[in-house]
Amino acid sequence: MEAALGLLRRMPPKQSETALSALLSLIPQHSSDLLSQVDLPLQVLRDIESGKDFILCEYNRDADSYRSPWSNKYLPPLEDALYPSSELRKLEVEANDIFAIYRDQYYEGGISSVYMWEDDNEGFVACFLIKKDGSKSGHGRRGCLEEGAWDAIHVIQVGSEEEEMAQYCLTSTIMLSLTTDDESSGKFGLSGSIRRQMKMELAVADGHLCNMGRMIEELEGKLRNSLDQVYFGKTREMVCTLRPPAEIVQMRLPDT
């Protein structure tokens, strides 16, 4: 099981679904563990009633149907489906509106969805999702890649309130893939994923949404910095070692 998870962590996000299917056929006895611990690139579905897109994941799935955060209905329709309580649904609606603003400010477009449900410990769980298409045909002013995708998954477990305090456990996963293709540099692809966790005890007087928002903003900022330093920084270092920039080569060449 550990070897399978290690392999999936090293697979490019584009190939993770194929790799997961192969592992499920090889070790079916671990299928439930693999499906619960492995994050796949996010898919999108259109809610005809609201006219908005929403993100599909295991957290809004029941059987083969997915619940829209906009209409609170399953697509395709499903009888005896699971729904959040009225109080939690109200919080979910507010979270979707606020997170859409966060998405536009940080990503300049894309698709976001928030789902909430009760857990078995008198608390609740919230899942915040963002999918950004950074290709030339994508939304937003920064779509300049041949292909590009940023998938962010933030899952927060909120414990029961004790003395006006609550425990928050945030697990964030970022999956990134990009491809450039131009005459000067040729075709280049880069992809990977990173996961981190944060735990905090915060006062509920500020509100759950405020607390969760601050945690997501802080951890996502750290993940962005890690991606920039590890993925892009190391890649830049390797490329410059193998193929130094033209100005450096000219500086090293003796005059003839």
From Swiss-Prot:
Transmembrane segments: none annotated. One of its GO terms (biological process) is actin filament capping. The modification N-acetylmethionine is found at M1. One of its GO terms (molecular function) is actin binding. Gene3D superfamilies: 1.20.58.570, F-actin capping protein, beta subunit. It is found in: Cytoplasm, Cytoskeleton. It holds the Pfam family F_actin_cap_B. Keywords: Acetylation, Actin capping, Actin-binding, Cytoplasm, Cytoskeleton. GO terms for cellular component: cytoplasm; F-actin capping protein complex. It comes from the Eukaryota. The keyword Acetylation applies. Component of the F-actin capping complex, composed of a heterodimer of an alpha and a beta subunit. Belongs to the F-actin-capping protein beta subunit family. PANTHER family: F-ACTIN-CAPPING PROTEIN SUBUNIT BETA, F-ACTIN-CAPPING PROTEIN SUBUNIT BETA ISOFORMS 1 AND 2. F-actin-capping proteins bind in a Ca(2+)-independent manner to the fast growing ends of actin filaments (barbed end) thereby blocking the exchange of subunits at these ends. Unlike other capping proteins (such as gelsolin and severin), these proteins do not sever actin filaments. This is F-actin-capping protein subunit beta.
